[in-house]
Amino acid sequence: NHLGHGAEAPRLGWFAKRNGWSRLVEDLKTVMDSLAAPGLPRVLLGHSMGSFLAREYALRYPDGLEALVLSGTGWHPKPLCMAGLLPAKALCLLGRGHKPSALLDRLAFSANNRPFAKAGGTACDWLSRDAQQVQAYVTDPLCGFVFTASGFADLFDGLLNLSRTARLKNLPGGLPVLLLSGSRDPVGGMGKG
């Protein structure tokens, strides 16, 4: 599990006191290093938030990575990142960093569900075409939990760093990258990637 996720997380949606995004990436590096095996290619697959972490990992640690697979990823321009980062940091400064933020959750995710909104639907209908899978996600306490204000600040900070196109020069020119996106995935621009 990522930091702030899973049954062992001390607080769901909270990553670290400081530099949570970097801590997530370093945690991923620890996992990647522990899985390294001589003679086997190192391929990193990330989905959704994991795709953003995989992109950051590839930018920081491109050596030894043979391929990158990004599923359900997207591009977030600087103004959009700042629109989330500023209120998240303000809540942290007001001492609410460790508390789940329904406001930031709506800001971050409500637009994803707009094309799928229907009577009797859920706020998570955008996640899958399979209504049973959506319901399983909604009822699982370890899925769809609301991040803390600090967790959102870390996420928006990470997305802001990924929006800096000058950083792309850190990727090796020959690194194979496979982009996957569902045809109705709002994070991937409805299949446009």
Where are these regions (language model features)?
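Alpha/beta-hydrolase-fold enzymes
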Residues: 54-142
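Acidic catalytic loop of the alpha/beta-hydrolase fold
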Residues: 144-145, 183-193
